Design a protein with these regions (language model features):
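P-loop (Walker A) phosphate-binding loop of NTP-binding proteins
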Residues: 36
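Conserved phosphate-donor/acceptor-positioning beta-strand/loop module used by diverse small-molecule
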Residues: 119-138, 171
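ATP-binding Walker
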Residues: 39
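Conserved substrate/cofactor phosphate-moiety recognition/catalytic segment
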Residues: 46-92
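Glycine-rich phosphate-binding loop used to anchor ATP phosphates in small-molecule kinases
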Residues: 75-122, 127-128
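Walker A/P-loop
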Residues: 42
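Small-molecule kinase domains that catalyze NTP-dependent phosphoryl transfer to phosphate-bearing small molecules
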Residues: 141-198
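Hydrophobic anchor at the beta1->P-loop junction of P-loop NTPases
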Residues: 33
Length: 198
């Protein structure tokens, strides 16, 4: 008998004194989209959902951190665990999952590494590498441009804040939205999978 999503002790190996809880299936896809503010992460995630259809869960850092918890982005903040739990639950429920956000490597890297290691299916990570000048230009067109000024945006900006181990595919600013979405659909195999009737 299978327990609630995220809790499957029958197939959870014990490593040392830590129980590793495997999530998802061999068929579920996990996609991680990272990059600086205004690098196009949310647009790419929305494009993936539009292209794929039902059965693709979008887990946005901004939605959970700012919208649900209304907390600052700090080391050890509660949103890190909430992103992890939400992704695991969706994977165990049979959804393909896109986790997207700035997700600074030093704050979110350990959580993302564990999630990647625990996922039974293929995991693909992408870093949208947009230079500061382009970030500033794009940000000026966003609804939150009045709330977040250029000084703050410069403070947030981290050039090539890549996860260790070379696990991310870097996509430059010269890649158009449709091109990026198409590439990720092909890389991950989502292009060949049917939408789920949910």
């Amino acid at each position: 008998m299978r327990s609630a999503p995220g809790i499957d002790s029958a197939v959870s190996p014990v490593v040392g004194s830590v129980t590793v809880v495997m999530v998802g299936t061999g068929e579920t896809r996990l996609v991680v989209l990272r990059g600086n503010s205004a690098s196009g992460k949310s647009s790419v995630a929305a494009g993936l959902r539009e292209r794929f259809g039902r059965g693709l869960a979008l887990i946005g850092q901004d939605n959970l951190r700012r919208g649900v918890l209304h907390e600052r982005d700090r080391p050890g903040a509660a949103n890190i665990g909430l992103i992890d739990l939400t992704a695991r639950y969706a994977l165990d429920a049979g959804f393909h999952v896109v986790v997207e956000g700035i997700l600074y490597a030093d704050r979110y890297g350990d959580m993302l590494a564990r999630l990647r290691a625990d996922h039974r299916g293929p995991t693909h990570a992408y870093y949208l590498d947009v230079p500061l000048a382009e970030t500033l230009a794009r940000h000026a067109t966003k609804p939150i441009a009045d709330e977040v000024d250029e000084t703050r945006l410069r403070e947030w900006f981290r050039p090539r804040d890549l996860l260790p181990g070379g696990i991310e595919t870097v996509i430059g600013a010269d890649s158009a939205l449709e091109e990026t979405v198409g590439r990720i659909m092909l890389d991950t195999g989502l292009a060949d999978l049917p939408a789920l009737d949910r």
